[in-house]
Amino acid sequence: MIPDVSQALAWLEKHPQALKGIQRGLERETLRVNADGTLATTGHPEALGSALTHKWITTDFAEALLEFITPVDGDIEHMLTFMRDLHRYTARNMGDERMWPLSMPCYIAEGQDIELAQYGTSNTGRFKTLYREGLKNRYGALMQTISGVHYNFSLPMAFWQAKCGDISGTDAKEKISAGYFRVIRNYYRFGWVIPYLFGASPAIFSSFLQGKPTSLPFEKTECGMYYLPYATSLRLSDLGYTNKSQSNLGITFNDLYEYVAGLKQAIKTPSEEYAKIGIEKDGKRLQINSNVLQIENELYAPIRPKRVTRSGESPSDALLRGGIEYIEVRSLDINPFSPIGVDEQQVRFLDLFMVWCALADAPEMSSSELACTRVNWNRVILEGRKPGLTLGIGCETAQFPLPQVGKDLFRDLKRVAQTLDSINGGEAYQKVCDELVACFDNPDLTFSARILRSMIDTGIGGTGKAFAEAYRNLLREEPLEILREEDFVAEREASERRQQEMETADTEPFAVWLEKHA
């Protein structure tokens, strides 16, 4: 089932320097909660400055949903320490609140208890909150409080030059974009390995369903927890953030121009379902528009092609201008065993897997094959640790045992690890392979099995509160290592100044501005 990459691996072993200079970045979301595990109802902590313009700390859907962002970094340890500094400073500046350590939200009785993220009075800030109002009215607020980790990854120019010859200009843009689309197609075919190893959301509070019926065969505990005994990541299931109306958009990952055209079409395609919500009610705007996507970011995807946007530029226009610059991996649950929600082992594994995805052949995929890849993902998400579980290839009927496929993949990853270790020194990548491959013969070692044992023991609330308390105490005590207190104070002040400048620079009323942007 795993494509034969022996030739590509042999090529890599002859060109190890092609992997020197991999760049990465991390984003981590987390809900602010009270000591009793309920959602914090306070505004964004003052010490963190403006959520609209802060370089490192912002908010996602809700005012209580923090998001930490590291700068692009070539050094794993430095990046993780930077992320830890963001957590340390925040833990010291959020009063008695703490950070929820799980992907699925804390106990929230009602969706209306969730305040949307607020970004001030500038047109841009109000637009961001209106977008969230639209998300709430389309999908429900609870679903939007699910949190995850995003891992951004780019291969060095040396890799593309070794692989494609001396490239520049439009040629480079097209060849590099084609190379990243290969990564994306392989990710859709084999990325289920990520929730298998690192999925950590096998259970939910019953309140999360809001009384809606579900076809999933949940087991229930006395304390109101619903779980699936072999599930890995309910966050990635249909309970999580998926968008049924997006499934027939037909967006594919074979070609830059095709992909962008599909995305641009989706933000112009009217939706009957969302038209029923209405645009305005009693003088209050309910969504930006009633199209399938309000804006491009609404497209749900476990992985995204990206380029840093310029001022006023949409994500797709940035891609058209310069091609794909990096890949955003979006399938990581919060790691509950790390105070910062992600650890070195995971980052090193993702490095290995992304390189493998760049090397392995990836035939073009039709939108129907793309839909078929969802079958493997769903199996792993809902019953990944079930004995005897099998996976298929695309829409074909042949089936293969998951543990065997996993071990075959790791045989290749081990060779990538040897190459990366040869240029970085040490054996850190090989060690990660040896640790993780054991999860295929012993699923009890996976994150989902480990966290489920704790949840069955003490409930989701008990587990979440215990980890949150321990991490709060730990992070508050640890000294900063890279950033200094004055860096945070300076960024707070600079972010507040930037927000003020945006607010005073606006010349037209929001309603007029919105007509041009909706």
UniProtKB/Swiss-Prot annotation:
This is Glutamate--cysteine ligase. It comes from Shigella boydii serotype 18 (strain CDC 3083-94 / BS512). It catalyses: L-cysteine + L-glutamate + ATP = gamma-L-glutamyl-L-cysteine + ADP + phosphate + H(+). Signal peptide: none annotated. Belongs to the glutamate--cysteine ligase type 1 family. Type 1 subfamily. The keyword Secreted does not apply. It comes from the Bacteria. GO terms for biological process: glutathione biosynthetic process. The lineage of its organism: Bacteria, Pseudomonadati, Pseudomonadota, Gammaproteobacteria, Enterobacterales. GO terms for molecular function: ATP binding; glutamate-cysteine ligase activity; metal ion binding. Its EC number is 6.3.2.2. Pathway: Sulfur metabolism; glutathione biosynthesis; glutathione from L-cysteine and L-glutamate: step 1/2. InterPro entries: Gln_synth/guanido_kin_cat_dom (IPR014746), Glu_cys_ligase (IPR007370), Glut_cys_ligase (IPR006334). Keywords: ATP-binding, Glutathione biosynthesis, Ligase, Nucleotide-binding. GO terms for cellular component: cytosol. Pfam families: Glu_cys_ligase (PF04262).
